[in-house]
Amino acid sequence: MEQQLNLGHLLTAARLLDIGALDISSLDLGALTSTSSSPGSSSPAMFDLSNESELRSLFCGKLKVDKKQSSCASNASTSSQPYCSSPPARKSSKHSRTAHNELEKTRRANLRGCLETLKMLVPCVSDATRNTTLALLTRARDHIIELQDSNAAQMKKLNDLRDEQDELVAELAQLQADEEVAQATSQACQTLSQSRPESRASSFTSTSSRDSPCYLEYSPSSKPMDSHKPTIIDLYAEGLIPRGPITFPRPLVYPHNVFDLMNLPPTPFDVSQFLPINLQV
């Protein structure tokens, strides 16, 4: 009886696998068990409905295995992470590794081309042993820093030149305005001088007389008639000033010392020798 029950379980499970697309809840397990019994058996059914839970567990396990295999087959074409023991999964993993290798080759080729371009842009060094990727990137970084500093210095110089240009433009505008004012003033002066030349000449004479010294001379036309008339006296003719230098009588022999001067004989003092030559009394 137990062997017949096990055989009935196997047959029922095979039928359930054939109709796996159906839902378990919609299955009539009683009908399946009744149809699974052979016509020559002594009992009408091989097992009763108490084995329904066991059949449900077997069928759910089979469905889980089928879903797992289908998910592995679908994901193997997009990524190489999941691994399935079925042959389609292994084939998809090989394709994914090949695609990954091709992508890696392309990436390395692009990186090599970028390094060659960078080597042409960055100034080279004399030491050939330092031409590594790290050394190239270091030199490129230093070169970029130098370019940034140079650009900052050039921008500062440009700003200074712009400020100086603005100052020069403002100074030029001020000079032009001053020149216009000077021209307008000169034109106004010329207009006034043409309208009143006599007044300008008199004002110029008064101004020049104030600025420069003036020597007054006797002029009968410029003096009133009742003023005292000055007289011109010739000092030389009148004998008030001698025509030659005043000299005193000197001794014939110069003394050598004070004692010789004291021992000189007395001479008569003549006052007329000290008077002017042309003195008239």
Swiss-Prot record:
Forms heterodimer with mxl-1 in the presence and absence of DNA. Residues 109-147 are annotated as: Helix-loop-helix motif. Disruption phenotype: Does not suppress axon regeneration defect in mxl-1 mutant background. Suppresses the axon regeneration defect in sdz-33 mutant background. RNAi-mediated knockdown increases lifespan, which is abolished on an mxl-2 or mml-1 mutant background, or by simultaneous RNAi-mediated knockdown of daf-16 or pha-4. RNAi-mediated knockdown causes delayed onset of polyglutamine-mediated paralysis. RNAi-mediated knockdown reduces spore levels of the microsporidian pathogen N.parisii during infection, further reduced on an mxl-2 mutant background. Transmembrane segments: none annotated. The keyword Metal-binding does not apply. Residues 71-80, 200-212 have a biased composition (Low complexity). Residues 95-147 form the bHLH domain. Residues 144-185 form a coiled coil. The keyword Transcription regulation applies. This is Mad-like protein 1. Ubiquitinated. One of its GO terms (biological process) is determination of adult lifespan. Pfam families: HLH. Transcriptional regulator which binds to the E box motif 5'-CACGTG-3', when in a heterodimeric complex with mxl-1. Involved in the control of lifespan in response to dietary restriction, the decline in protein homeostasis associated with normal aging, germline signaling and may overlap with the insulin-like signaling pathway. Plays a role in autophagy. Involved in promoting infection by the microsporidian pathogen N.parisii, possibly together with transcription factors pha-4 and zip-10. Residues 95-108 are annotated as: Basic motif. Residues 71-105, 189-213 are annotated as: Disordered. GO terms for cellular component: nucleus; transcription regulator complex.
